[in-house]
């Protein structure tokens, strides 16, 4: 049983837990029926074959979508009245291509830069699919998702360390200091994935609005997720690489359900709303 003088530490830990960064969009959870329909879409939607773009053409290919998507992402950021520094980060973000990396992946890093692997470009079915991925990653930039994940990781580390100190206080002199170290690492690991699926859904939804503003088909967001799902299962080109773009992401049926709902909203004129 914790001693009463340790109560302030527990209150601090509770405050840190409640302070973890969460998504900011107002997004309803899809129904069971919508998830079932989404599951069917993963297997039945027709998508174009992979273009198998050579490494020498990758930079030029991605640059075709860079300007329109970056401009549209900045406009969406301003319309959402997000902090100006976030919108400026969208304009300042570098776009990098790792042509020799054959995994299908893309990411936004803690410098607010966006990277594409060669596999993502090589296996894409259209420029619009690449535009969808780029819009998704710029949405991460505008929401500051990488910073939020780092903050959540640090909070998790502090919480884990606090639990370890509490145990040490009550177990002394028999406590092993390695337990506190392990708890800090565990807390950091848990914090680093806190809200990750929701942040991905938030970026997917925002990307669809960016695509529409840039003049691309909102359906391309659906198509690229279907392609990634099938590639992950080894259904494209017999090359079953792991798909980093799907790691820490929501389940495919849940993700597609949100995407289909967002596409309907865009086509119906429903605005993007913050909570």
Label the predicted regions.
Residues 11-14:
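Cleavable N-terminal export/targeting peptides
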Residues 28-31, 204, 209, 217-275:
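Extracytoplasmic and endomembrane cell-envelope/extracellular-matrix remodeling and assembly machinery
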Residues 1-9:
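Bacterial N-terminal signal peptides that target proteins for export
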Residues 16-19:
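C-terminal motif of bacterial Sec signal peptides marking the signal peptidase cleavage site
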Residues 21-154, 213-214, 233-240, 272-275:
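Peri-catalytic and regulatory segments of divalent metal-dependent proteins
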Residues 171-220:
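Metalloprotease/metallohydrolase-associated module, dominated by Zn2+-dependent proteases
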Residues 57-64, 68, 115, 125, ...:
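Extracytoplasmic/secreted proteins, especially bacterial periplasmic and envelope-associated proteins
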Residues 146-181:
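Post-HEXXH active-site segment of zinc metalloproteases
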């Amino acid at each position: 049983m914790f001693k009463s003088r340790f109560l302030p530490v527990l209150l601090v830990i509770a405050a840190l837990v409640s302070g973890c960064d969460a998504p900011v969009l107002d997004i309803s959870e899809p129904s069971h029926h919508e998830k079932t329909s989404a599951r069917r879409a993963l297997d039945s939607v027709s998508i174009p074959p992979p273009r198998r773009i050579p490494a020498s053409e990758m930079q030029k290919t991605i640059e075709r979508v860079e300007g329109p998507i970056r401009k549209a992402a900045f406009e969406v950021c301003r319309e959402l009245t997000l902090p100006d520094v976030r919108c400026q980060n969208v304009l300042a973000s570098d776009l990098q291509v790792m042509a020799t990396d054959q995994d299908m992946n893309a990411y936004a890093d803690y410098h607010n830069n966006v990277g594409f692997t060669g596999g993502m470009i090589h296996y894409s079915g259209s420029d619009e699919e690449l535009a969808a991925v780029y819009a998704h990653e710029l949405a991460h930039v505008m929401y500051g998702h990488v910073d939020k994940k780092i903050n959540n990781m640090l909070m998790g580390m502090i919480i884990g360390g606090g639990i370890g100190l509490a145990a040490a206080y009550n177990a002394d002199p028999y406590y092993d200091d390695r337990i506190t170290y392990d708890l800090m690492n565990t807390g950091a690991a848990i914090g680093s994935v806190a809200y990750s699926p929701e942040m991905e859904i938030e970026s997917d939804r925002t990307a669809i609005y960016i695509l529409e503003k840039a003049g691309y088909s909102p359906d391309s967001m659906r198509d690229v997720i279907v392609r990634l799902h099938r590639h992950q299962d080894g259904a494209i080109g017999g090359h079953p690489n792991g798909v980093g773009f799907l790691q820490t992401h929501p389940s495919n049926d849940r993700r597609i359900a949100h995407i289909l709902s967002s596409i309907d909203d865009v086509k119906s004129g429903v605005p993007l709303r913050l909570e």
